[in-house]
Design a protein with these regions (language model features):
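Hydrophobic alpha-helical transmembrane segments of membrane proteins
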Residues: 1-72, 81-239
Length: 239
């Protein structure tokens, strides 16, 4: 079932990979233009943050669509609820592995090759690399100036949590819409709008550094996923 679902949705996987590759190329073009035409003397290697987050957003969207619509289609084609859920979950996890793998590959490509390219575009005689706010070394001479490059990336465990969390929450969003229909969609949309417009009153730094934030977040994701499994295994399929 899982292999069949993967084969049937290869176009979705290609679309996700294309979006990630396009995001990578766009960020490199913007950086190159700033160095070449704006005369800036510093740059950021951000693919290690941007690409995992973009992958997570894509996984959330596609998993939501699979769960809310494709799940019922599978049941209409004589699959059991259990096999349909397993197939869609396996599909989403496979796409997560490919998306995060591509993100890691593009991040390594940026880290290996762009310092030399950016140095040439900026007219610098070398570059100074910073990782996580700490100097990691200087390369070249200071006959003109050294280009300052700050490398920012997420730790591997955060990337894994993003991938798994977005897949599980995508299942929850899809199950919510599947059970409650249009009302469920608007409830989720309203919650999202509250989250977006409530940014000014949310103290993210305090939340991220609190000892309970990550355990509570993980518990919430697990509980919503368990509810999703319960709901989908008892779902009424609309004809």
């Amino acid at each position: 079932m899982i292999k069949k679902m993967i084969r049937l949705n290869l176009d979705d996987l290609a679309l996700q990979c294309g979006i990630l590759a396009g995001t990578f190329v766009l960020t490199q073009l913007i950086t190159a233009c700033l160095l070449l035409f704006a005369g800036v003397r510093s740059s950021l290697q951000l693919s290690g943050v941007i690409l995992p987050l973009a992958s997570g957003l894509l996984l959330l969207i596609f998993t939501t669509v699979y769960t809310s619509f494709s799940f019922e289609e599978c049941i209409r084609f004589s699959h059991t609820r259990r096999s349909a859920l397993a197939g869609l979950l396996g599909l989403s996890l496979f796409q997560a592995a490919v998306a995060m793998g591509l993100s890691a590959l593009l991040t390594l490509l940026e880290q290996w090759f762009t310092p030399t390219l950016w140095t040439a575009l900026s007219g610098a005689s070398g570059y100074e690399l910073w990782i996580g706010g700490y100097a990691a070394g200087s390369y070249g001479t200071e006959s003109t100036f050294l280009l300052s490059i700050d490398r920012i990336s997420l730790p591997w465990w955060a990337v894994l949590l993003i991938a798994l969390g977005c897949v599980l929450e995508g299942v929850f969003f899809g199950a919510f819409v599947q059970r409650f229909g249009r009302k469920g969609f608007w409830i989720l949309w309203g919650a999202w709008m509250v989250f977006i417009f409530g940014q000014s009153v949310i103290h993210w730094d305090d939340l991220f550094h609190s000892v309970w934030f990550l355990p509570v977040l993980i518990a919430l994701v697990v509980l919503t996923f368990l509810w999703s499994v319960w709901s989908l295994l008892r779902a009424a399929v609309r004809q």
